[in-house]
Amino acid sequence: MLRQAAQTRCWRTPARFVSHRPAFPRSNPVSAALGGTQFRKLSVKTQTDKNTLSDKKTAEADTSSSSSSAKSAAPSQQKTQNATTAQKNLLSESTVANKEQRKADWAIMREMAKYLWPKGDWGTKLRVGTALSLLVGAKVLNVEVPFYFKSIVDSMNVDFAAVGGTAYTVAGSMIIAYGATRIGATFFQELRNAVFASVAQKAIRKVARNVFEHLLRLDLNFHLSRQTGGLTRAIDRGTKGISFLLTSMVFHVVPTALEISLVCGILTHQYGIKFAAITATTMLAYSAFTIATTAWRTKFRKQANAADNRGATVAVDSLINYEAVKYFNNEKFEVARYDKALKAYEDASIKVTTSLAFLNSGQNMIFSSALAAMMYLAADGVATGSLTVGDLVMVNQLVFQLSVPLNFLGSVYRELRQSLLDMETLFNLQKVNVNIKEKPDAKPLELKQGGQIRFENVTFGYHPERPILKNASFTIPAGQKFAIVGPSGCGKSTILRLLFRYYDVQEGRILVDGQDIRHVTIESLRKAIGVVPQDTPLFNDTIEHNIRYGRLDASDEEVRKAARRAHIHELVERLPEGYRTAVGERGMMISGGEKQRLAISRLLLKDPQLLFFDEATSALDTYTEQALMQNINSILKEKGRTSVFVAHRLRTIYDCDQILVLKDGQVAELGSHRELLDLDGIYAELWSAQETSLAQDPEYERNAGLEGETAGEVEDKAPRQ
C-alpha cells in the first residue's frame, strides 16, 4: 500500500506529470524532520523598528553581522514595546494629574477651534459669525426683560379709580414690549441653533472621518492588539462629545460671561456697589466651587468610562466568538465576565451620581445665599424709600436672570469635562504613530522584470528575544510558482507580512524587480500583491460584494467569471438569493471551503502581478482542491504571474518550480521537489512523514482514487504532441 501510494501520479500543469519517489518509513520521522524544533504559535504583539535602521543598512545589507544587528535593533524594539504598551493602555482611562489633564483639555479645545474657524471655509465662518450675532442679540433682549418688568410694576402702583385708567392705558406699551422682547430673545436663540447645527455636524463628520482614516493607516500590530468593543465605544462617546464641546464653546461659556458682565454693570449703575459686590463674590465662589468639585469628580468619570470600555469589549468579544462559547458551554462564564464589568460600571456610576448631588447642593447653597442677601438689600431700599417696588422686582429678576446661565454654566462645565474626557481617547487615537511610512521621494513600483522578489540578509522579529527571520536570503524568480514550507513559527507568513509592508525589516532589505520596497509608494506595492490568507476575512454583506471587493469597479460579468474560475459559481447559483446571499458576520453563514473559494475569486478578480496563497485550500476536499488548483495553475501559466504558496501539506505544493524550506528563521533547503527529495534532508523527512500518515489513513485509498481519476481526466484532455 505504501509503495502504491508513493507512486500515485500527480499533476503539475494539464500536460505535465511527475512520479514521486517511494516514501520509506523512518524512525520517528516527524521529530527527525524538525530536528527537535519546537512548534511555536505566531504571536504578534510588538511593533517592528521604524525605517531609520533599515535605511541605514540598505547599502551594506550583504555584509551586516549578527552582533551589530542585535545591538542596533535592541533600542528600536524597546521603543516599539513602549509604544505597544501605550496602545494597550489607550482605552484604560487612567487618572492623571490635574495639571496634565488641563494641558490635555486645552490641547483638545485648541484642536476643536480649528473646526469652528477653518481656514478657507468662508461658509462655516459666516455661519459662526451669524450665530454669534444672534447670540448677542438674544442676550441683550434677555437683559432688557427685567427693565420692562420694573416699569410695569411701577406703573401699576397707582390708584386706577383716581386716574381713571386701565391696565392697557397705564402699562400697555410696557406689556407689549415685555412680550415682544421675550419672543424676540427666543426667536434669536432658536435661529442661532439652526444656523450653527451644520457647523457642529460638519465638525463631527470631519473628526470621525479623520480618526477612521488614521485607524486604517495604522500598522498591523495596533489592530492585532486592539480591543474592538472598547475602541468603538470610545469613538462613539468621543464623537457625541464633539457637538457638545463646540456648542458650549460658542453658546455657553462666552455668552454666560457676557450676560454676567451686563448684569453686574447694570446692578452697579442702578443700585450701587453693594449689589455688584455680592454678584461678583457669588460668581467667584460659584465658579471656584464648581471647578474644584468637578476636578475631584473627574476620576469617577474616568473609572466609569474604563468600565464601560471593558464591558463593551467583553460583550463584543463574546458575541463574535459565539460558536466557541457554545462549543464549550461557557455561557455562564461569559455572563459572569460581562456582569463583572457591569458591576464595575455600576460602582463608578454611583460615585458619579452621588458626587453630582454634592456639587448641585453646593451650587444651590451659594446661589440661594446670594439671592437672599440681595433681596434683603433691595427690601431695605424699598423700606427707606430709596428704591421702588419695581426696583425690588427688577433686582429679583436680574438675579434670577443670572441663575439660568450660572446653573447652566455649572452643568456645562460638568458636561464639558465629561466631553473632554470622552474626546481624549478619540484624539489620542489620532496621535498613535504610523510606523510604516512612505519616504517623501517614494516612487510607484514598476514591474519591468515580471515580478522577481529578492530577500537580502533579512533579519526580523516580533520580540527582541525571539527573532523570526535570521539573515535570510533567497530569490523568488519572476513568473514562477514558488513554495515556502517549514514548521509552525518558522516565519512563513512573516515573509508575506514583510513583503506587504505590514512591518519593516530590522536588517537587510527586500527587493521587487530590483526596487527596495521601502523606496516605493505603499499603495503601488500593495496594489501589485494579492493575498489569500489563512483566515479568510469576509464582510457581513453579500457574496457579490465580497468578491467585488477585489476590484470595486468590476462588472457583474467579471465577478461571475472570477467565481467560475474559483469553482464556486455553480454553488452560488443554487442558493435561493444567488449572489445576493449574505455571508454573515465574518462569513460564519458559509463553510470554510466556501470562504476560501470566495477569497480566491476575489484575488483572481484583483489580478495582481504577485500572488500569495497562505494555506489557501486547507479547508477544501481533495477533489475540489485539485480542480481549483488546475484552474489556478493555468491562469498563472497563461499570465506569467509570480506566485508563492505557503503550505503544511506538501502534496499541495510539490509541483512548484522551487520549494524553500525554513527552519529556525533561516533558509535550510531550496530546490525543486525532486531535488529536495534527492537531498534527503528536512523536506524529505517531512514528505516521508506525511506520506506515511496518509498511507495509514482509511480515507486515503478513496482520496487516492479521486486523485488518479482527476489526473486521468487531465491527461485525456491534454493536447497530444
UniProtKB/Swiss-Prot annotation:
Its EC number is 7.-.-.-. One of its GO terms (biological process) is intracellular iron ion homeostasis. Residues 41-96, 694-721 are annotated as: Disordered. Disulfide bonds: none annotated. Residues 18-127, 197-245, 292-357, 414-721 are mitochondrial matrix. Glutathione binds at R297, T298, K299, F300, R301, N360, S361, G362, Q363, G410. SUPFAM superfamilies: ABC transporter transmembrane region (SSF90123), P-loop containing nucleoside triphosphate hydrolases (SSF52540). Residues 1-17 form a transit peptide. It holds the Pfam family ABC_tran. It is found in: Mitochondrion inner membrane. It is a multi-pass membrane protein. Residues 453-689 form the ABC transporter domain. GO terms for cellular component: mitochondrial inner membrane. Homodimer. This is Iron-sulfur clusters transporter atm1, mitochondrial. It comes from Emericella nidulans (strain FGSC A4 / ATCC 38163 / CBS 112.46 / NRRL 194 / M139). The gene is atm1.
